[in-house]
């Protein structure tokens, strides 16, 4: 039992000590979002030691921006490499079937996805639920929400 605890303590010491010093920062895969913006939001700094847990924090911060569909970080020869796949930008949101301008305005204001912002797939289902709730509260009990997403060539929807 004592040996088990010693092994665990040694494991934690070894994993916490292993940190890499970043001399260079390389960003790959970005088109719309600048390297500087990614470095700023990830709070990545040169000449700083980064452990795996600190790299995970950087990943979390970058995902929280909703700018990226996928982010990965690797460490190669004192260079931190951040690979990103950007979320598309919402070009236009069209509501059809609702004639009441007040309800349309309410629908536009309440949804999470907005024009000229990043398109996040997980927010589509949430917005559908929000729309259904608003329509039911306004007497449209049998309304059907159909989402259609058209991808364009310039990484917009």
Residue ranges and their predicted role:
Residues 2-10, 18:
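Sec-dependent signal peptide recognition
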């Amino acid at each position: 039992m004592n040996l088990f605890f010693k092994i665990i303590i040694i494991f934690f010491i070894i994993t916490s000590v292993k940190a890499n010093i970043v001399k260079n920062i390389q960003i790959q895969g970005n088109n719309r979002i600048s390297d500087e913006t990614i470095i700023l939001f990830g709070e990545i700094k040169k000449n700083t030691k980064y452990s795996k847990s600190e790299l995970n924090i950087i990943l979390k911060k970058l995902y929280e921006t909703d700018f990226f569909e996928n982010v990965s970080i690797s460490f190669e020869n004192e260079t931190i490499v951040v690979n990103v796949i950007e979320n598309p930008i919402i070009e236009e949101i069209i509501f059809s079937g609702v004639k009441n301008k007040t309800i349309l305005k309410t629908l536009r204001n309440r949804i999470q996805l907005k024009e000229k912002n990043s398109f996040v797939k997980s927010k589509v289902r949430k917005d559908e639920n929000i729309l259904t709730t608003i329509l039911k509260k306004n007497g449209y009990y049998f309304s059907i929400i159909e989402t259609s997403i058209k991808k364009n060539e310039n990484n917009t929807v």
